């Protein structure tokens, strides 16, 4: 298992897509800071460095780019022959998925660090006298979004293993993360309401594209209890990880 993780880390650090994704996410958030600099003067209680660092989560851009990167990363191990060579040597194919998941988690944390540094510097450049704000709130956002982004990585890996076509996988992940597939939720919600009789039933928030923006927005603005905030991300993470694990076991991924 450790050898698999080391190899995947080697691929991560040698891949151009890794650095492109990091710089793209950081660049987008810096651009958002420059465009919303006046916000810090109008609402000083919210216009802080920690608040600006959540912008990239609010827009869903981090989630989108991370999901697309997971497809590129997974496609790479298939196209370079790594899967074909390693599967006969691994007694449990789930280890391949788990090693990928560990590396995706490292990629997420590295990207958060790079984005935080770039955004913090940009905040002090564009806004005079800006305050640091609550790092606890920002830490909670990063922590809860961690599970959502790994859930998206699981989706990306699952689709790539199933389709085995780069462009089709990119299109499928884009549809899921952008919320295009969320059109099924109202119909499913209506059916469940009829079955259960619960008129207050709401499953639209289970759409992963909506969950990402709701988590960061809730932490910073609504101050919801931590347990209430992290339940959905963890459930989605476990759900999609199980689906990905079953897929790699049942599917010929060579």
Regions found by a protein language model. Give the residues of each.
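Generic structural signal for small/hydrophobic residues in well-ordered secondary structure
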Residues: 8, 90-92, 159, 165, ...
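Helix-capping/transition residues at the boundaries of transmembrane alpha-helices
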Residues: 11, 75, 86-88, 156, ...
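Junction motif at the cytosolic side of a transmembrane helix
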Residues: 8, 232-254
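Aromatic- and glycine-rich beta-strand/loop motifs that create alpha-glucan
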Residues: 1-25
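Transmembrane helix boundary and interhelical loop/hinge segments in multi-pass membrane proteins
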Residues: 70-89, 93-94, 253
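Juxtamembrane non-transmembrane "cap" segments at the membrane-aqueous interface
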Residues: 185-212
């Amino acid at each position: 298992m450790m050898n698999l993780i080391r190899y995947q880390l080697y691929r991560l650090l040698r891949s151009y897509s890794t650095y492109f994704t990091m710089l793209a996410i950081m660049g987008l958030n810096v651009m958002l800071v420059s465009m919303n600099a006046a916000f810090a003067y109008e609402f000083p209680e919210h216009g802080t460095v920690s608040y600006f660092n959540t912008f990239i989560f609010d827009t869903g851009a981090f989630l989108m780019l991370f999901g697309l990167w997971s497809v590129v990363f997974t496609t790479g191990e298939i196209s370079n022959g790594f899967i074909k060579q390693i599967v006969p040597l691994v007694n449990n194919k789930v280890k391949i998925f788990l090693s990928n998941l560990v590396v995706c988690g490292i990629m997420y944390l590295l990207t958060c660090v790079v984005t935080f540094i770039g955004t913090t510097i940009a905040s002090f450049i564009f806004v005079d006298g800006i305050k640091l704000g609550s790092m606890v709130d920002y830490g909670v956002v990063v922590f809860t979004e961690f599970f959502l982004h790994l859930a998206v990585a699981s989706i990306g890996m699952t689709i790539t293993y199933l389709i085995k076509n780069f462009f089709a996988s990119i299109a499928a992940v884009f549809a899921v993360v952008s919320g295009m597939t969320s059109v099924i939720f109202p119909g499913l919600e209506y059916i469940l309401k009829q079955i259960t009789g619960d008129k207050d039933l709401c499953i639209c928030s289970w759409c992963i594209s909506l969950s990402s923006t709701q988590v960061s927005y809730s932490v910073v603005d609504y101050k919801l209890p931590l347990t209430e905030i992290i339940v959905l991300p963890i459930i989605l993470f476990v759900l999609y990880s199980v689906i990905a694990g079953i897929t790699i076991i049942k599917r010929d991924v060579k």
